[in-house]
Amino acid sequence: MNGWEKTVRIAIDAMGGDYAPQEIVQGALLARAQLGVDIVLVGSAEAVLPELRRHNAAQSVEIVDAPEQVGMGEEPTIVRRKPNSSIMVTMDLVKQGRAEAAVAAGNTGAAMAAALFRIGRLPGIERPAIGAMLPTLKLGKRVLLLDVGANTDSRPRFLEQFALMGALYSRYVLGVAEPKVGLLNIGEERGKGNELVADAYEMLVKNPHVPFAGNCEGRDVMTGRFDVVVCDGFMGNVLLKFAEGVGLVALQILREELPRGIPGKIGIALMRNNLGQVKQRMDYAAYGGGLLLGVNGVCIIAHGSSKAQGILSAIRLAKEALDNRVLERIQQQLILPM
């Protein structure tokens, strides 16, 4: 970083997720060291401060005290009754300009509700979408799947906007020069699917600002054929969790099927590097959770089970979105006629 570059400041909900605050604090400190970002930890000072002391960082990291918490099982609307919860205060910091991005693990619905209540939608966007990265058969290539849970019920117009935002994200953040957008469907042919998907297809075909490449069947999501795959939040969430489960099952089957005894140990030794690479490519923690596209601020919703590396990845994702001016580019595109 040179002397002319501005340090990115990111607010992190230290109380969200299964391993808060220990893993959240550790991941945030890793991000500060590796990415050069400035971090603000939001949560119960009584819980967060001892963790910072364990890492000798109590004097160098700001804590914003937020005494209330939102549990994993609570309804999203509970955030209205908990204005001092860590997730609401995290979003407040972005709204007030005290942070440029927010990162939160834990209750996805509550995080999205807090972002909408505090930050609001981008002008022209009817519904936000959560985008998640999945690995593909092509080494180094990822596919952006959205929506993965922000809207269980959707409309054709929403899917059209998801496609536009996803294409812009793929182009400017992921570096795909000519992204191909697919619509998740039960067949490749035009006219396939339910009314929602069929109507969305016709809208996407006619939209000159969306690089629409046609329907995407479930088997093609992770082949690398598409750069962006669009669907409603119900289907996207099911698909995302199915993909995560398949990865875990595949690795476990591989371990169980290797020969036992000395031959098995020799085989594992010979394949150690390959197995490590397979695990790394299929590890959801490496992808940092999902970017909440369509809100008037950069918000990353990490997996509820995120540990330190997952939080580091989520913060990296936030920094990439800021560095590549995702919000500005989406706003510019929305000005164009659709």
Swiss-Prot record:
Signal peptide: none
A single Gene Ontology CC term: cytoplasm
BP GO terms, sorted: fatty acid biosynthetic process; phospholipid biosynthetic process
Keywords of this entry: Cytoplasm, Lipid biosynthesis, Lipid metabolism, Phospholipid biosynthesis, Phospholipid metabolism, Transferase
One Gene Ontology molecular-function label: phosphate:acyl-[acyl carrier protein] acyltransferase activity
Enzyme class: transferase
Pathway, per record: Lipid metabolism; phospholipid metabolism
Function summary: Catalyzes the reversible formation of acyl-phosphate (acyl-PO(4)) from acyl-[acyl-carrier-protein] (acyl-ACP). This enzyme utilizes acyl-ACP as fatty acyl donor, but not acyl-CoA.
Stated family: Belongs to the PlsX family.
Name assigned to this protein: Phosphate acyltransferase
Gene this protein is translated from: plsX
